[in-house]
Amino acid sequence: MRAVFGCAIAVVGIAGSVVAGPADIHLVAAKQSYGFAVASVLPTRGQVVGVAHPVVVTFSAPITNPANRHAAERAVEVKSTPAMTGKFEWLDNDVVQWVPDRFWPAHSTVELSVGSLSSDFKTGPAVVGVASISQHTFTVSIDGVEEGPPPPLPAPHHRVHFGEDGVMPASMGRPEYPTPVGSYTVLSKERSVIMDSSSVGIPVDDPDGYRLSVDYAVRITSRGLYVHSAPWALPALGLENVSHGCISLSREDAEWYYNAVDIGDPVIVQE
């Protein structure tokens, strides 16, 4: 097995990734006084999410007229301490999200309303992952303190970056399949997922093709960019980039991160 397995599955729309989950029955409504029927709002009532989670409103019918979209946006109110600014993004004709300009305060409650409907959600600890393409590392901080899994015994002193708090040896995309630089939000967590290169145009029987089951997969884009376990890439972790774009970790590090991170926590990829 070559150490270049990547990280693609069937393409799905970002709205589907973000909005997946049970509808909050307190927010399912018929036509409201402001004129638009709301199907669901995320996060759901009482849900604990990461500090970068957007507020996502799904309407029961498409809204395409610019004036109507502005009216729908004005009906969305978000209250937090301290007060937050943000921007609206339409993911589809019936889905709009409000993205805060900075991270929500950790361990806090956010109140939101859409017209006459109201709800609230909570944020957990600020679990921030930073992938460095040039340093071949994935560094995780929790509430501003760099943390990571305890080393196994006997401690692997030969491991790259051993003893550096929160720093995990990683491997990102090789030159042909670079990991895109940018800021992302955790969309979902999958204990095991099938990754298939044909979903990104690489036949499975191609020399670069693959189809395999991957553990501890944390999805950060709708097109299949993940932080995940990659035991086949152990010799490259911390030393070189060999994946098809995903952030590859050891099984132990991937399991720890999978258990620590919430949906909505940020992942930052930098050179």
UniProtKB/Swiss-Prot annotation:
Q: Give yes or no: UniProt keyword Transferase.
A: yes
Which GO terms fall under molecular function for this chain's record?
acyltransferase activity; peptidoglycan L,D-transpeptidase activity
Asked whether the UniProt record includes Acyltransferase among its keywords, one would answer: yes
Q: Which CDD domains match?
A: YkuD_like
Gene3D superfamilies per the UniProt record, alphabetical = 2.60.40.3710, L,D-transpeptidase catalytic domain-like
Instruction: Show the InterPro entries listed in the entry.
Output: Big_10, LD-transpeptidase, LD_TPept_cat_dom, Transpep_catalytic_dom
Query: What is the active site of this protein?
Result: H228 (proton donor/acceptor), C246 (nucleophile)
Keywords, A to Z, come to: Acyltransferase, Cell shape, Cell wall biogenesis/degradation, Peptidoglycan synthesis, Transferase
State any GO BP term from the record. Answer: peptidoglycan-protein cross-linking
L,D-TPase catalytic domain spans which residues? 127-270
Record's PROSITE patterns?
Answer: LD_TPASE (PS52029)
| EC number(s) from the headed UniProt entry | 2.3.2.-
User: Which domain of life does this protein belong to?
Assistant: Bacteria
To which pathway does this protein belong?
Cell wall biogenesis; peptidoglycan biosynthesis
Per its Swiss-Prot or TrEMBL record, what regulates the activity? Answer: Is irreversibly inactivated by the beta-lactam carbapenems via the formation of a covalent adduct resulting from acylation of the catalytic Cys. Imipenem is the most efficient drug for in vitro LdtMt3/Rv1433 inactivation.
User: Which principal EC class is assigned to this enzyme?
Assistant: transferase
| Protein name listed in UniProt | Probable L,D-transpeptidase 3
- Which organism encodes this protein? Mycobacterium tuberculosis (strain ATCC 25618 / H37Rv)
